[in-house]
Amino acid sequence: MRRFSALATIATLTGVALTALATPATAAPNGPKPPSPGDTVPVAEHLVGPLTFDVTPNGTLYIGQDFAGLLTRVSGGASEVLATGPSIAAVSTLGDVVTWGEREGDMEQVFASRLMQRTADGTVTSIDVLAWEEANNPDADAEYGFRDLAPDCLEQIPPFLLPFVGQHGGAIDTHVYGSLMLKDVTYVADAGANAVLAVDSAGNISTVAVLPPSSLIATNELAASFGLPSCVVGHEFITEPVPTDVELGNDGWLYVTSLPGGPEDASLGARGAVYRVNPATGEVQLYASGFAGATGLAVAPNGTVFVAEMFGNQVSVITKRGEVSSFAEVPSPAGVEWERGRLYVSTDVFGDGNIVSIGLR
């Protein structure tokens, strides 16, 4: 993964106000009425980068405080640190087992990437995702960047930018950012590998699907903002997909949020998306788009999908007809989970982070 802005550098944005607003689609007049928010109850406070979390049927929270490197359990008002590590994300649970991801590295390279699991008795296991990525690199044959620039134009691009904007395949990178634990398999949204992975109970990793890239046409504004020569204007730039979360729908398909690569806020438009992925065949379908930072999603039992828009300051809802509208305005949301008829959302993730529970009506 090589891109102007990457999830690996989100921690550097702590304290920065991100106020770019998305303009969501509205539900068709004759379509089903989307849900609206009811009461809002705070369930965890004073968190440091709660980018991902999970909630159990009894209300216990397992929280990845990414910027602090903490995996925290909150139950009955009491908080307990279960694990420490670098860049903790991809938190999910199944019964008394909790899964999370750890990453060591920066925007340029990754030094370690692990999928971790902790059982009820405190036993922790680790799967080396970086070793698998180095051996397999599922998007190695993809084509990203500018693909049709003349040689004299390429020569004008600053050398330090050329690996990011020149034509290139998927680099060796992995960032276990979202996960979903099921009985015999854990699915991973890998924001570095640009793919959805499956990890079986023996720890074997396989590729479910590589998400499709998105594209934009370079404008004068884009060229100026990134220090690119004017000869790139009017050319198509292919950006890498950035899978951020994965959930199972009631139709048996996986639902996956993705950032667009390149600038991941709305500075070049709200380009985040939700995809449907067939876990048996790897087929990928675009389900909805136009999100300003689609970093987390939840699927209700009736098939309604909720999407956290980190840079849009809202949670959006997608009806079963595929119509998108705003569900609730919340500051800098990241994770979103559904449990027992309520929506749980992590908010203010770049400052004094919180998790709230929102009723529906």
Question: Model-found features: residue ranges?
Answer:
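Extracellular beta-propeller repeat domains
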Residues: 27-361
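Secretory targeting and sorting signals
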Residues: 1-29
